[in-house]
Amino acid sequence: MPQQSILLDRSHQVTTRRRQTLSDLVQHTHHPSPGVRKDAVMGMLELVKTYAGFLELHCAALINAALPLLGDDDVHVRGAVATYFGVLLDRLDDEAFAPFAPSMLLLTTSAMSHISMAVRIDALRVLSLLLDKVPALATEDWESALDAHSGSDRHGQRLLQAFFAMLGVAADAHRQRLG
């Protein structure tokens, strides 16, 4: 069939051992099968590790493709994503990562409030990476997290509120303050 990838000439493209391009892998991050999503993340990691300068050249696509998978329902996909972001954050300088930090913090916060406890716990792994990479942004305005009258909506405040919610602390602290 003409649309089959085996017939495409990829001799001048960067590919994985399975002859998948970044475009193929990005598409596979949306696949219904968790195994395919995990393989897509690991394929993107392979491209980053194999080709010098690939991360810098395709930073936006590499980060944005995996961000929605932070809250994936499959444990293996989340594990691959945490490993993937661990490598990416180690290799990216702060300036290159800065445009993506707010989105990653927001999606990490979202994963921390997921209905599944396993997703919430895995989000803490990513939070740890973010606290190492962008500590000032991640903790910005954290001290007002339990203040019901605070109009602030900073990353630190949201992260701490999500963390307290995971522990069941926020409601108790608020009730004690009221009365």
Language-model segments: residues:
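N-terminal "cap/leader" segments of large eukaryotic alpha-helical scaffolds
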Residues: 1-45
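Flexible loop/turn segments at the boundaries of HEAT repeats in alpha-solenoid HEAT proteins
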Residues: 7-18, 48-59, 89-101, 129-156, ...
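Amphipathic alpha-helical segments within extended alpha-helical solenoids and repeat-rich scaffolds
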Residues: 15, 65-71, 106-114, 130-136, ...
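Short coil/turn segments at helix-helix junctions and helix-capping linkers
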Residues: 24-36, 65-80, 95, 107-119
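Alpha-solenoid HEAT/ARM repeat scaffold
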Residues: 38-42, 60, 79, 121
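Conserved hydrophobic register position within alpha-solenoid helical repeats
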Residues: 40, 81-85, 123, 178-179
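Hydrophobic core/packing positions within alpha-helical solenoid repeats
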Residues: 43-47, 84-88, 127
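Internal, conserved structured core segments that host functional sites
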Residues: 117-132
